[in-house]
């Protein structure tokens, strides 16, 4: 299998105004990503999404009140991945877009923000293919049916991001019956990957999604058993400073 390492910058590196960023004691994220990539084995294909997002920094690519990227930001990340893979991305206009209402996320919660603060809006773009199904392992270990994009309009205002893959489930399998070949991949991710995977579903007959924070399997076994062709490691750059997460990931790839 071919291994791809995909690093997503955070909003600090993309949308923070330059005059504010100058006062932040932090290495520029594009340089940090290059430094990380330089330490990887030569066989690993690297994909930095820094430039893809920086080109659209004036657009609504990150939430204001949350640490995640928006569905539109994830779309630009998907375009960057397609360029690396040599496949044609769908145009944004090809997707059906739905809005699920106001959203306030982790930044708001962490700062006990003013109730009058301008809220985010959570929107999602549905896959172009019309024969996509999803199953995932819930917290009790049971395999249940789910949706790649779930209607989160009735969820609590802080839970709207659960629209993507129905949240952070340990193990998810997505099937696209419109694709007749045997193309498959595994996505090893944290929550930033949730908004990105729906775009990838149009290009693979099977996608296995692993949230390494909760999964306890061995990646090598899964790749061999399912005859997986591509492995995508998808992380936001701040994950690298979390020794617990690095340790969890290390356990699964050994």
What annotation goes with each model-predicted range?
Residues 1-254:
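Extracellular glycan-modifying ectodomains
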């Amino acid at each position: 299998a071919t291994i791809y390492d995909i690093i997503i910058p955070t909003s600090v590196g993309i949308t923070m105004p330059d005059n504010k960023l100058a006062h932040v004691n932090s290495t520029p994220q594009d340089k940090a990503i290059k430094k990380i990539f330089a330490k990887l084995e030569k066989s690993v294909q690297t994909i930095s999404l820094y430039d893809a997002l920086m080109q659209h920094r004036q657009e609504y690519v990150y939430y204001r009140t949350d640490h995640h990227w928006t569905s539109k930001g994830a779309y630009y990340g998907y375009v960057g991945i397609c360029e690396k893979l040599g496949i044609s991305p769908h145009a944004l206009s090809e997707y059906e877009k739905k809005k699920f209402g106001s959203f306030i996320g982790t930044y708001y919660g962490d700062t006990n923000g003013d109730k009058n603060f301008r809220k985010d809006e959570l929107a999602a773009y549905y896959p172009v293919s019309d024969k996509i199904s999803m199953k995932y392992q819930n917290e009790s270990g049971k395999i249940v049916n789910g949706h790649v994009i779930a209607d989160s309009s009735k969820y609590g205002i802080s839970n709207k991001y659960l629209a993507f893959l129905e949240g952070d489930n340990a193990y998810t399998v997505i099937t696209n019956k419109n694709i007749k070949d045997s193309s498959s991949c595994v996505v090893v991710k944290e929550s930033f990957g949730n908004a990105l995977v729906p775009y990838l579903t149009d290009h693979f007959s099977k996608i296995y999604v692993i949230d390494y924070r909760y999964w306890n399997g061995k990646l090598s076994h899964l790749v061999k058993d399912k005859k997986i062709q591509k492995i995508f490691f998808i992380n936001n750059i701040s994950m690298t400073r979390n020794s617990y997460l690095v340790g969890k990931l290390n356990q699964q790839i050994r």
